[in-house]
């Protein structure tokens, strides 16, 4: 007798009075459906391009407050960079490398067919940046059914200009028709601590050249053990004996807590289904006084009004708030990390925690002269706050007037308002009179897609499907910013309490209208061809150039359908695609744009003043010369790949090669100041991204009770800047980082440029004959921004009801500049600065250039190791702070037990799972001292990478999870 079931392997058994049969999953016979562009559902075998999918269960294995972090290491070609260890912090995402010079290369996010915002607005690029997260972090992971990553232009062409850098298509969970009501509870409690702390020396006090100086926050003073019989003045003015406090930095950080709780109710009747969900995320950070709270309510409901007319609504409301998120970067009075890492080894962290303010309410600074803020003054007095309200929702109506014809309209909106406030209490070093700044942000996206689809099968062998559609997309952005200075009453942060206020308001609007079409042909379920085309009209481009068309063609061939013997190779597909897409630019770059000014400079008086002036507000003209002849950016994409399945699916191999060429970049080039402008927008530049992606799945062992699955991903992308503007060999993407610049240089990938050590032909350091220190040379390429390759290896072991899995995340290549390490070394606090301190004749290995042009071995000792490190690790000597950013990490661990359902037969409980979960647990190998090599100063809205600038240290988390279905 044969026993079969959909999606399971058929088994033949001998007939007995009592049979117990366990059917195994049959991944070969189960038709996998993938959600692609415009929400079109296609069979996986029909796709002529690479699509990677992650199920919702994979995302919630070890939940993160930002869902993007859960994708790290799981998808080939997808690179995630977490910006900091701040609670609710942001993460940038990139697919197949950076393709643009003038704009951020970030994929489009889609939820249930609606494009949503993933911005991360930050008014400053380097000064006092507070990481407030990116908008994709608002998405609740418990509501996600699946995430499909569309990588190539052929996969995303129907979305138009917005998806030139790929698309992340999210499908949310729904109820089921004719299903009883289920209540599901998912609760996690996590503990969080700093992943990696600096290695400090604990032998020397603060000072200079071995002499104690309480005014200095460093480690260049006397050896502590040699002055035990002496007393010195501390930061409070008390006489003390010097003593090392090895854990003063470690003890500053707290154990963060994270509570993520979700309750959902789902079910359905004969004509309707529904799912309601509520999630609360409550976090306290490792930085004292920092917290993040997010509350998300979602609904997804569908209704069959008639046999041929249906409707579905999907909506999410998110409310989040935070307090005490610390500032990062430079040049800001509220910076914490330089203060904490810069603590002299003699300072007791518990002492300054108890003595940050005197009885008169005045700050007790870290030095008697009041030049360094007490970190606990910043934590208690200068709290950054923000709150956000966001609504994402769409309504989809579907009508089927005749057999084979489907008409769908999907209308939706994504809008949010956010308020931020940064404060500096009176008495703060750098802002003694007190000040504050507020932002009121508003973003709204409106999108409507009307589509008509017709499909028909001919002669049983041919299947034809055609779709035409129309899209209207509009987004609005507003920013109301007020700077208030010189407070009358301390800690009263109202505009009327400030002697000077400077309002700066800005708004912009953009509209895109498009028409598109899609034709699919299939023959005998083994040969598939898909052709798409889209034409967009953009409001941000000149009238003559605002219309642009981009086509795509893709195909797949299931060659194993022609094979008789499939014992070894069960399934084989070859796929091929080509696409050409265009994109526009930001609004208001075609004409003269005047923006509000907050300050003005009186040349002859040499003073800076603020607006309003004598009751009049000020405006300034554009810095960039408008260009009315701009054309759309253009990208051509070619992709070829194969999907193979061996031995009944026990070996699964997907391979892809791609080549993306992006030209007509819209960039700003410098122009003579005599023109009255700083730059001019032009079409120029050509960037190539070529690479390979491999996904390998193995099931090495599978028995009745035990199964081992191994899934590995590999991706390598080579970026090359093939062309820039005429006469231009390099273009600065980002600067203002202690002389370091991120540049696009002709013939290279995006790289780090700055001051390097001068070398002879053999690579030896050239040493200054007077100081014994290395000589420097400017504007040298110091390293690549992006890695050579990335890998992820995920192992899952299942034994009866026990599941154990762990994910290894690998990055090879790329460089990292660290300002944190520069500060640690130049201040004499890093452990490695102990070497040769007592050696008065340390000679740096290298050569000295002689008068006749020849070199001789260096024989000049440095004056002291203080001079050596303050030169070698000086932030302006960039090469001294560049490191190999490669790493191997234990990214994720999960252990869970599913209690047998038979235990609950007489109860209302349908299922119960208990588990242990951990994220970012261990840096197995890296080449960067003191900090996490994954540290990234650039957020999702910035171009560049490979830079760490006084960032909040990253964290590891571990805890417990309970899942219950009633």
What residues fall within each predicted segment?
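Short, small/polar-rich motifs associated with maturation and membrane association
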Residues: 1-298, 304-306, 310-312, 316-318, ...
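Glycine-rich, aromatic-lined ligand/substrate-binding cores of catalytic
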Residues: 784-819
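Conserved small-residue
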Residues: 184-239, 589-590, 603, 682, ...
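Extracytoplasmic gating/loop element in the C-terminal half of outer-membrane beta-barrel translocons
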Residues: 234-238, 249, 538, 813-913, ...
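Short aromatic-centered micro-motifs
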Residues: 3, 109, 521, 759, ...
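Acidic/polar loop-and-plug regions of large Gram-negative outer-membrane beta-barrel proteins
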Residues: 239-240, 318, 323-390, 443, ...
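Extracellular/periplasmic, surface-exposed regions of secreted and cell-surface proteins
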Residues: 59, 106, 221, 259, ...
